[in-house]
Every structure is written in structure tokens, then in C-alpha cells.
């Protein structure tokens, strides 16, 4: 996912 935002935590 994106490097920032909710999916950036992965």
C-alpha cells in the first residue's frame, strides 16, 4: 500500500 496513511504502518 502507500508509504503513508493506515496501510503505511505495514
Curated annotation (Swiss-Prot):
Report the main location listed first in the record: secreted
Quote the cellular component terms of the Gene Ontology held in the record: extracellular region
| Gene Ontology biological-process annotations | neuropeptide signaling pathway
Q: Where in the cell is it found?
A: Secreted
The source's superkingdom equals Eukaryota
Keyword entries, A-Z: Amidation, Neuropeptide, Secreted
Q: What is known about the tissue distribution of this protein? A: Expressed in the antennal lobe (at protein level).
Q: Which residues carry this modification: Arginine amide?
A: 10
| UniProt name for this protein | Tachykinin-related peptide 3
